[in-house]
Design a protein with these regions (language model features):
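Beta-sandwich interaction modules
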Residues: 45-49, 96-146
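A short beta-strand element within beta-rich, extracytoplasmic domains
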Residues: 50-72
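Predominantly extracellular/luminal regions of secreted and cell-surface proteins
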Residues: 1-25, 76, 91-102
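Short, polar loop/linker segments at the starts of domains and inter-domain junctions
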Residues: 20-32, 179-182
Length: 182
């Protein structure tokens, strides 16, 4: 399990023309590590996966990309019809993001994944040549076109379990002695 770590347990690329996966999980963990290319062509995928739910991914870009519109998808366990659902990432909606633009792999940055109804953990299956058969929460992204493919040095995540619940904050701060609660 990867609970509390900033690293994904699966960083894969999928080349649709060659129907092959690239497993970049280890390279993506190294600060200043070996760069790897994300998309050769339109319709190729970058796949982010982890056994624990996550709500943010950070990309340390080495070569700026020039891509067409991005399509982001997550694996939905929606009432028995498990399928990829398209969504719009949430970073553009954050206060303080003056440009209100989505992350586009043209520079270092992050993307936020907040409203993913029925996001579920499953084994990734596409062509039978997947790097492993571990059930994870997956998000994937594909560009409409590729003028310049971005390369990335490192990819990080923020786990849902990086947050404290109100009761954990209450216990941690020992508020029962100051509020009279038991």
């Amino acid at each position: 399990m990867s609970a509390g770590t900033p690293y994904f347990t699966a960083i894969w690329t999928y080349d649709t023309s060659a129907t092959s996966f690239g497993n970049h999980t280890n390279e993506a963990r190294r600060r200043g590590g070996t760069s790897f290319e994300l998309f050769d062509d339109a319709a190729d995928y970058l796949i982010l996966g982890d056994e624990d739910r996550f709500d943010l991914s950070y990309f340390d870009i080495d070569t700026a990309g020039s891509l067409g519109d991005l399509t982001w998808q997550y694996w939905s366990m929606d009432s028995g019809t498990n399928e990829w659902k398209t969504f719009v990432p949430s970073l553009a909606d954050l206060e303080g993001n003056d440009e209100e633009e989505e992350f586009d792999f043209s520079e270092d940055g992050a993307e936020l994944f907040l409203d993913l109804p029925n996001w579920g953990s499953a084994v990734y299956t596409a062509s039978g040549t997947e790097p492993d058969a571990v059930a994870r929460y997956y998000i994937r992204v594909t560009p409409a076109s590729v003028a310049t493919s971005p390369t990335v040095k490192m990819v990080r995540k923020r786990s849902y379990n990086a947050y404290c619940s109100p009761s954990e904050v209450y216990e941690f701060l020992n508020l029962r002695w100051t509020t009279g609660g038991f």
